[in-house]
């Protein structure tokens, strides 16, 4: 059983310039990368050259986050949302991203905002060839965010019914809002496009606290998940000093080879 980990540059080595974070991810044996919205602000030629040189794949990136953490569900802002979605699709496909995360934004959860989000997601799907991800975000982390629970995300996906629309299953957020990770994964497995991990209590390194990832991650694999595990956590100190949490899983890999 092999575990591949994706370095989230929005959190790991955040104190360093963006391209330096990528180099350190390679140096510290990450299999792939995932971005927030950094590619919107840098030279894409330099980025593509570095990704090619380091032979790192890219799981995904975000649309512009802005002050409202996206705006795709905010009524009255669809022109802005669709302009930013189109720009992000162009960038994501140019740099070889597997997926684009469309943030809904901070707005009330009601039928008008639901319809707005659905319309803008349909626009994204029509104008792209890559995976489109939506992510439930817990109230504690981001008060007022439109999409909070995995059931809400699943309802949106059911309404649109498109094979390239999936859920970003962030274990930190799912645990806070919906509880039992494995139960929720099983219930929505066919709708999950990417998994992210962090400690439950403080969003630090994934092997601290109540979530036993040494058990949970192998279970995700046994239940059919084949993707990388996104490391979107807040390091408790220098990023490289806290990477030993991966060691028990690497040991599991070696045990299965014997």
Locations of the language-model features?
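N-terminal small/glycine-rich loop or linker at the start of catalytic domains
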Residues: 1-9, 59-72
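Histidine-acidic metal/acid-base catalytic patches
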Residues: 1-29, 41, 52, 87-98, ...
